[in-house]
Design a protein with these regions (language model features):
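N-terminal periplasmic/intermembrane-space "pro-region" immediately following the signal or transit peptide
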Residues: 7, 21-99, 346, 351-357
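Acidic-residue sensor for enzyme active/binding pockets
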Residues: 31-34, 50, 139, 189, ...
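Short Gly/Pro-enriched turn/cap motifs at secondary-structure boundaries
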Residues: 73, 115-116, 197-201, 294-298, ...
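Outer membrane beta-barrel
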Residues: 78-267, 339-365, 372-374, 378, ...
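Outer-membrane beta-barrel pore domains
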Residues: 111-112, 261, 270-434
Length: 434
């Protein structure tokens, strides 16, 4: 009996164990199948995401390409410091600029009756740019008139022979301060070694010029007609040339030397040319120093030497010029003029050097503005006519409000040896250029 029961029990136990093992195996297979299905689903999602990423990348690349095409195919407009329009390919430009110089002055009278008042010293509108490889510039000064009297620069220019050729109405290459922009001159008026004195009334001439420049040198030559834009036709001709060299030219220090020469030959139709001195500021008394009559066919020859430097906030500049004015009957007359001027930027700043033209620019203005203390002594003399000389002392202050605006104050004390006059002038200028 007992063996039978024992055998039955063993049979039941074995069958239960086998059944349990089979059940567990089935569960394991089911779990493995489920995991495989989940893994396959995940792989499918990864593939889908990769395809989407590739597609989006293609879209991004295509979009960037389209934006590049859009940027290169759009005309650019810049309104900083004026209005400038540039074509998409950069081959065409047009820029509108201008300057407003508004003056007020009063005289400390001596022997000459003078009138203090206000006036627009300059009111210019400028159009410049480039087209088909040529540069162009047209400038009208409405303070001098709306016709040819107010015409200033009017020329075309093209890069050639390692430099630039200019054709039209522009300044001959002579005198450092004459070639400095009126927006950047140190005092309200230029010294006697310029069209303010030695080349009175001959600031812009019609002709052709060539200028070549490097990092520390310039060399320029001009051949011109003695006719200005508003003067009568003439067969008189002239020539001028200037060279400069800056042995020191760094971001904070510049030392400049230069020299120039000018020849003016009067001929049929030429007007008189003269050297004169407004020794007590603009609209003050004037003294003629020498004259060459146009009908005589005589000449005027001049040369000048330049030295200037800018070291940190300190600046100096000087020129010496000698001119010979031929006379039809009497001996020739020699004119000598020289000036020395300087400045100190009281709260920092530096007058940078324009290596392309061999002159100095205004300092770059920070948010707080810049104060500049200025001084100049200026002298001109006819060495062959007794007491035909004049001089002036100028003390001033410039305040650079920003890159476009400057306020100037000048006190000028003049002296005329010929008449004994010692008129003085107080002058203020508000200047805006764009």
């Amino acid at each position: 009996m007992r063996p039978t029961v024992l055998a039955a029990a063993l049979a039941v136990a074995l069958s239960t164990t086998v059944f349990s093992a089979q059940a567990q195996a089935q569960d394991t297979n089911s779990e493995l199948a489920e995991l495989k299905a989940q893994l396959a689903a995940l792989q499918a999602k990864v593939v889908e995401l990769e395809e989407r990423t590739d597609a989006q990348s293609d879209v991004n690349v295509d979009t960037a390409g389209q934006l590049d095409k859009l940027n290169t195919g759009t005309t650019k407009v810049d309104t900083k410091g004026g209005i400038k329009v540039t074509s998409a390919d950069g081959k065409f430009e047009a820029q509108v600029g201008g300057r407003i110089h508004f003056d007020a002055y009063a005289f400390d009278r001596d022997l000459v009756d003078t009138t203090g008042t206000t006036e627009f010293r300059r009111a210019r509108l400028t159009l410049s740019g480039k087209a088909f490889g040529w540069d162009y510039k047209m400038e009208q000064d409405f303070s001098a008139g709306t016709n040819l009297d107010g015409l200033r620069d009017l020329f075309i220019a093209k890069s050639a022979f390692g430099g630039k050729v200019t054709i039209g109405h522009f300044k001959p290459y002579r005198s450092m301060e004459e070639l400095t922009s009126s927006n950047e001159i140190l005092m309200m008026e230029r010294p006697f070694a310029s069209a303010t004195g030695l080349f009175s009334g001959r600031q812009f001439q019609q002709g052709v010029g060539y200028l070549r420049a490097g990092e520390n040198y310039t060399a320029g030559f001009t051949a011109f007609n003695m006719r200005g834009a508003s003067s009568s036709r003439t067969e008189g001709v002239g020539a001028a040339g200037r060279v400069t060299f800056a042995p020191i030219n760094t971001d904070n220090s510049t030392l400049h030397f230069g020299g120039w020469a000018s020849h003016e030959n009067l001929n049929k139709g030429s007007g008189n040319i003269s050297a004169s001195a407004n020794y007590a500021g603009r609209r003050g008394p004037s003294q003629t120093i020498a004259t060459v009559t146009g009908d005589s066919g005589d000449t005027s020859n001049a040369f000048g030497l330049e030295a200037a430097g800018s070291f940190g906030p300190l600046f100096f500049q000087g020129e010496f010029a000698n001119a010979t004015f031929e006379q039809p009957l009497l001996a020739d007359q020699d004119i000598q003029t020289w000036y020395l001027q300087g400045s100190w930027l009281l709260n920092g700043g530096h007058k940078a050097y324009k290596s392309g033209t061999g002159v100095f620019a205004s300092p770059k203005v920070a948010d707080k503005g810049l104060w500049e203390l200025t001084a100049r002594y200026d002298h001109i003399e006819n060495k062959d006519v007794q007491d035909r000389e004049a001089s002036s002392w100028i003390l001033g202050m410039n305040y650079y409000v920003n890159a476009n605006m400057r306020v100037m104050f000048n006190y000028t004390k003049g002296e005329n040896e010929f008449t004994g006059d010692e008129t003085g002038q107080y002058a203020v200028r508000t200047q805006f250029a764009f």
